[in-house]
């Protein structure tokens, strides 16, 4: 074996090797013997099949196994020469050449190594942080909203006309070209006027109706309606209003606190205000982080933390971004890329910068998570997916299985870890007085659900 190994930088190495044809052929008998012990061929007892017959019937498999064995031997020798072990690798080596010549094979491969990351400039990367502390006006607004959310709906007299914020019970049926359409009919349907639960023009048409009244009205579906078969269509609806209920507003006092904080002993308005203040502060913090500071922090990490990246991982990320992009392309563009190898190569190359940044940030986040002992339990991943399923009307088990089949659970976990690491760095950079506010509010800022 003629082997040459070159370490390009701390995260990349390259090997080139020449191996004689005999190196491959000498492996055939041993591999054929292993196959002969397992296969069953008519007329022969298991383990008694002649090697010549095995070599003939399983020639392709024998050659493939021999080549794989030879490649593994080359890699083993390369690792030894580099002074590395499997734990030092990142991903699998990328075989860039395996070519058979008259007397030998030529093999070339790129090897990715776990990068060395120095985190001494992290503090320089974290932008200044200042979260808006909720004032009395904001707290009062939230209390009024809670009083509204927890208010009960009560029956009104039959003469009262429907108005915004009323709860209506209706039957309705929609028609297009005088024919009912799918999903356009419901009975005893509850609707809060002004909630945008239905199309705005539909809700407006119900304003002023009285219990027992029936009404017909035209309606044009928006051109970008989520149900494509209805988008832009002219329709008319028949509606019968059965019942109008109005909110019985709650006063903002200790009784409201007992309703909202039902699991609390001795709930008071003062305690509710503290909880609301805490939740508003955390909401302001999350909004500031998600809409502005996390992206700034990522840009700074990318710019200031410098280390060698394994090119094999960048190439894999480019492949992933390219494949994902194909799903959102028009059929004509996909066809164009399929017909032109040069165009496909150029399109894939356009993802290099994004892939490089993504790989780099992932390595940095992973290093920070290990240093600060920040992690995400598998149950937290499942809870996140359960919430996603609930919000999108999907079956949670089916969604989790879909993520599992597509090997996406690890990506979800990594995204959650990234979110926690970035928030941790930003929290540490809060002004001292706001860090104190945060520590004080965290225990008291339980999620207050709408009624």
Swiss-Prot record:
EC number(s) stated in the UniProt entry for this protein: 5.2.1.8
Domain of life: Bacteria
Keyword check for ATP-binding: no
Top-rank EC class of the record's enzyme: isomerase
Residue span, PPIase FKBP-type domain: 165-250
GO biological process: 'de novo' cotranslational protein folding; cell division; chaperone-mediated protein folding; protein transport; protein unfolding
Function: Involved in protein export. Acts as a chaperone by maintaining the newly synthesized protein in an open conformation. Functions as a peptidyl-prolyl cis-trans isomerase.
Pfam families xrefs: FKBP_C, Trigger_C, Trigger_N
Name of the protein: Trigger factor
Reactions it catalyzes: [protein]-peptidylproline (omega=180) = [protein]-peptidylproline (omega=0)
InterPro entries listed in its UniProt record: PPIase_dom_sf (IPR046357), PPIase_FKBP_dom (IPR001179), Trig_fac (IPR005215), Trigger_fac_C (IPR008880), Trigger_fac_C_sf (IPR037041), Trigger_fac_ribosome-bd_bac (IPR008881), Trigger_fac_ribosome-bd_sf (IPR036611), Trigger_fact/SurA_dom_sf (IPR027304)
SUPFAM superfamilies: FKBP-like (SSF54534), Triger factor/SurA peptide-binding domain-like (SSF109998), Trigger factor ribosome-binding domain (SSF102735)
Compartments in which it is found: Cytoplasm
Family to which the UniProt record says this protein belongs: Belongs to the FKBP-type PPIase family. Tig subfamily.
GO molecular function, one term: peptidyl-prolyl cis-trans isomerase activity
Any Gene Ontology CC annotation: cytoplasm
Free-text comment about domains: Consists of 3 domains; the N-terminus binds the ribosome, the middle domain has PPIase activity, while the C-terminus has intrinsic chaperone activity on its own.
Protein encoded by which gene: tig
Keywords: Cell cycle, Cell division, Chaperone, Cytoplasm, Isomerase, Rotamase
